[in-house]
Design a protein with these regions (language model features):
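Bacterial lipoprotein signal-peptidase II cleavage site
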Residues: 13-14, 27-44
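Extracytoplasmic small-molecule ligand-binding "clamshell" domains
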Residues: 45, 50-123, 271, 280
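Periplasmic-binding protein-like
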Residues: 65, 141-148, 221, 225-263, ...
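Bilobed "Venus flytrap"/periplasmic-binding protein-like clamshell domains
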Residues: 65-68, 79-89, 124, 145-200, ...
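Short helix-initiation/N-cap motifs at beta->coil->alpha
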Residues: 84-85, 99-110, 192-207, 244
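Extended ligand-binding regions for polar small-molecule ligands
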Residues: 84-93, 154, 158-159, 163-172, ...
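Acidic, polar ligand-binding/catalytic clefts
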Residues: 88, 92, 97-159, 232, ...
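A ligand-binding cleft/hinge motif common to bilobed small-molecule-binding domains
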Residues: 107, 123-132, 176-179, 207-243
Length: 291
């Protein structure tokens, strides 16, 4: 064999090896690129699924539709109020749809435990109920007060002896007058009434007071303030029945949803949105979250 032929064959063989190696490398590179594309698509799909899950979520808030300024129907037939505004902002920040679900207050536990609502958010007193629900942090300081007609001669709690007093069924006002634990003073007060009438809602109570069917109403101070601003001929006693706090009540054990809502409320406190909503409803002096 000639020397030139020998080197030509060696060169041709070497070139073939290089080409084969290049093809393997290229295929490997294409495979890596394909794997990377597939991984990226999976991540995008997962993120899209999460976004869709959030956007599809309904947040169903159970509330008393006759409990201003926390939740009620306005003159336009819309459900409005401080608590509903807070819930709306929480939903907006989480991509949820808010469903405002009016409930009978004395059926609230059944609604919550059956899953008909996600939470009770409407001037809901946590004081004395701490172990019955999974609670948010308290966000309003509340007082239970007494409202009477002007000129009735009732100026202090003791003047309620022998009187007919109205209170909402299954309310914190009723609990303040009937709870047996560490409540001797209020139990004595309630025993002095000629009658303690339970009504379905406070609008009914105020109509009964105006008509003279009852002598006084035991009610939350926020509701009393709202009613006294929109009605004439009523007065609020300086004496308070009890002080307490409002919070959002979730089904016992539903900590995941509670934590999501609470973290959003905390964000709203930090950026000032919570205080802005409180100012809108003249409740700045009563809110306590973040203070």
């Amino acid at each position: 064999m000639k020397k030139e032929d020998f080197f030509m064959k060696r060169a041709t063989g070497f070139a073939a090896v290089l080409m084969a190696a290049a093809m393997v490398f290229t295929m490997a590179g294409c495979g890596s690129s394909k794997d990377a594309d597939t991984s990226a698509k999976k991540e995008t799909k997962t993120e899209d699924s999460k976004d869709k899950e959030n956007s599809d979520k309904q947040f169903i808030v159970g509330f008393d539709a006759e409990y201003p300024p926390y939740g009620y129907k306005d003159d336009n037939g819309e459900y409005v109020g401080f608590d509903l505004d807070l819930a709306q902002e929480v939903c907006a920040r989480n991509g949820w749809e808010l469903v405002k679900q009016p409930i009978d207050w004395d059926s609230k536990d059944m609604e919550l435990n059956s899953g008909s609502i996600d939470c009770i958010w409407n001037g809901f007193t946590m004081t004395g109920r701490e172990d019955d629900y999974t609670w948010s942090k308290p966000y309003v300081d509340n007082s239970i007060v007494v409202v009477v007609k002007e000129g009735s001669g009732i100026e202090k709690k003791e003047d309620l002896a022998g009187k007919v007093v109205a209170v909402q069924a299954d309310s914190s006002g009723l609990a303040a007058l009937t709870d047996e634990e560490d409540n001797e003073e209020n139990l004595k007060l309630a025993a002095s009434f000629s009658d303690l009438q339970q009504v379905a809602d406070y609008n009914t109570a105020f109509m009964n007071l105006e008509a003279g069917a009852v002598d006084a109403i035991v009610v939350d101070i926020g509701v009393a303030d709202y009613q006294l601003e929109s009605r004439t001929g009523f007065a609020m006693l300086d004496d308070k029945i009890r002080t307490e706090q409002y919070a959002v009540g979730f089904k016992l054990g539903n900590e995941e949803l509670r934590d999501r809502v609470q973290s959003t409320l905390d964000e709203m406190v930090k950026d000032g949105t919570f205080d802005d909503i409180a100012k809108k409803w003249d409740l700045s002096d009563m809110v306590c979250l973040g203070k």
